[in-house]
Each structure stands twice: as structure tokens, then as C-alpha cells.
Design a protein with these regions (language model features):
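Hydrophobic transmembrane alpha-helices and their helix-loop junctions in integral membrane proteins
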Residues: 1-165
């Protein structure tokens, strides 16, 4: 690839990890989701920067699936803030008793965005990883490594609120 392609791939890997790391550290519910968006939009840039048909297909799939999942998560966060005034992750404890449907929808969205098999988030991340591997390049492997590390961080920052909603007392 060209230097511009290499730069785009490196920058996308950096922002995937930066967004995920910042999301883990963020305690404000909606800001955590915003950092997650930075990371996930970088997945799209990574896939498109591969400059292959499968990379572009993966980018479009993740664009669609991420949009559907993330709007669901933001709607849940907004509903929590409007109904309870709670904005911090630590304040979500016991919320499933007050807003069971909202918490259930958030949890389904979270496990999908984490990349749980058979859910949309898994499909698009699988397509991105497969497209990166198909390139047979070192940068493709760097992209796969960034995706795998980010998947672990995504589980941490999205399941933290869910665990608090269900398993921490009021």
C-alpha cells in the first residue's frame, strides 16, 4: 500500500484503542458511549483503509450495525437520565428494579456491540477482521490485534454499567 494507506491504518488502530481506553476510564454514562463511538467509527476507517472489496463491505456493514446498536444504547442512557437524573456509572446500581425494560434493551445492545457471536456487532467485526487477514500484510495483522484488544476493552466498558444495573444493590 501507499504511505497514505499505511498512515490511515495506523491512525485508525490508534483511535480504536484510544477510544476504547478512554471509554473504560470514563464514569459519565453518555460520555462513555461517545468514546465508544470514536473507537467504533475507527473500525469503519480501518476496514475502508484496507482498500479491498471485503474491507469496504465490512466498513458498510459496521457502519449500519454500529449505528443501530449505538442509537439504542444512547436512547437507553437518555431514558435513564430523563427518568432518574442519573448520569454516572456508579449511580446505575439497582436500576433494573426501576427500569427493567430499558436495562434489558441496554444489555442486549451492549452484548451485540461487544461482538457476541450471532449478533450484528459480531458479524461486522468478523467481516473487518477477515478482511484485514485477507490482505496478508503486517498492517492487516496490526488491525486484527487492535480489534481483539478493543473487544476486551469494549466488554469491560459496556458490561460495567449492565453489571451495576443488575447486580449492585441500590
Amino acid at each position: 500500500g501507499t504511505w497514505a494507506q499505511t498512515f490511515a491504518l495506523l491512525l485508525s488502530c490508534f483511535t480504536i484503542l484510544f477510544g476504547s481506553t478512554m471509554a473504560v476510564r470514563e464514569q459519565h454514562f453518555k460520555r462513555r458511549l461517545a468514546y465508544s463511538t470514536v473507537s467504533n467509527l475507527s473500525y469503519i476507517v480501518l476496514a475502508a483503509s484496507l482498500m479491498t472489496q471485503s474491507g469496504l463491505t465490512a466498513a458498510l456493514a459496521h457502519m449500519l450495525f454500529h449505528a443501530l446498536i449505538k442509537i439504542t444504547l444512547f436512547f437507553c442512557a437518555g431514558a435513564v437520565m430523563v427518568k432518574t437524573g442519573r448520569t454516572q456509572i456508579e449511580d446505575l446500581r439497582g436500576l433494573s428494579r426501576v427500569m427493567p425494560f430499558t436495562c434489558a434493551v441496554y444489555t442486549v445492545g451492549a452484548i451485540s456491540l461487544m461482538g457476541t457471536p450471532l449478533l450484528p456487532g459480531f458479524v461486522s467485526k468478523w467481516l473487518i477482521g477477515s478482511a484485514a487477514i485477507e490482505t496478508g500484510t503486517a498492517m492487516g495483522m496490526v488491525g486484527v490485534a487492535a480489534l481483539l484488544i478493543s473487544a476486551v476493552l469494549t466488554a469491560i466498558y459496556l458490561m460495567g454499567p449492565a453489571m451495576s444495573m443488575y447486580f449492585r444493590p441500590l
